[in-house]
Amino acid sequence: MSETLLDVKGMNCPLPVLRANKALRALKPGERLRVLATDRAAVGDFKAFCQETGHALVAASEEAGVFSFVIRKRETPQ
C-alpha cells in the first residue's frame, strides 16, 4: 500500500494538521499518510481531525518524543 511521509517535527498547533490536510488532498482515496510530529497537542488534534473529515487514523504511536500518525484517506469525497 502506498504511504507518503510528512515530517512536521518542530511545528506547533495548528500547523501539523494544516500540513497534513494539504498533503491528504494530493493523495488518492485509500492511500496513507504517515505524519511525524513533536507537538504533544498533535495527539488529540489528529484524532479530532480524522473524526471530523472522515479520514481513518489507523495507527498512532510515540517514540523518544516523536509522535507518528498513519492516516488513510477516505474513500469518497465528503
Residue positions per predicted region:
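Right-handed parallel beta-helix/beta-solenoid
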Residues: 1-7
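Core SAM-dependent methyltransferase catalytic element
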Residues: 68-78
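Amphipathic, hydrophobic secondary-structure cores in small proteins
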Residues: 8-60
